[in-house]
């Protein structure tokens, strides 16, 4: 009978044999995709962006909304933490006055 350790090692070796070629093809720099990425990296800053309506000097409405919501969540979390701390102090024997 085959031991479970031997079977596990066989399965791991088979998995590595199947995954290694796929990973090497992903990592390799051959093909059109890396060339397109390189071209996109070179042409990242383009004056035509302003013509497309992409503001680069002002925050978007989504960013402003995100920061307002983040501030609201932080205020609520701070209030909850303060309330919890206060309740713990009043419930503990050290916080009670005799």
Curated annotation (Swiss-Prot):
InterPro entries on file: GN_domain (IPR008647), HSV_GN (IPR034707)
Keywords assigned: Disulfide bond, Host Golgi apparatus, Host membrane, Membrane, Signal, Transmembrane, Transmembrane helix, Viral envelope protein, Virion
Signal sequence segment: 1-24
Quaternary assembly: Interacts (via N-terminus) with gM (via N-terminus). The gM-gN heterodimer forms the gCII complex.
Transmembrane domains' residue ranges: 61-81
Processing and modification events after translation: O-glycosylated.
GO annotation, cellular component aspect: host cell Golgi apparatus; host cell membrane; membrane; viral envelope; virion membrane
Protein name: Envelope glycoprotein N
Top-rank taxon, per record: Viruses
Naturally occurring in which organism (per UniProt): Suid herpesvirus 1
Topological category with respect to the lipid bilayer: Single-pass type I membrane protein
Main location: virion
Pfam families found in the cross-reference section: Herpes_UL49_5
Keyword Membrane: yes
Side Intravirion, residues: 82-98
UniProt family annotation: Belongs to the herpesviridae glycoprotein N family.
Function: Envelope glycoprotein necessary for proper maturation of gM and modulation of its membrane fusion activity. Also plays a critical role in virion morphogenesis.
Virion surface side: 25-60
Localization per record: Virion membrane; Host membrane; Host Golgi apparatus, Host trans-Golgi network
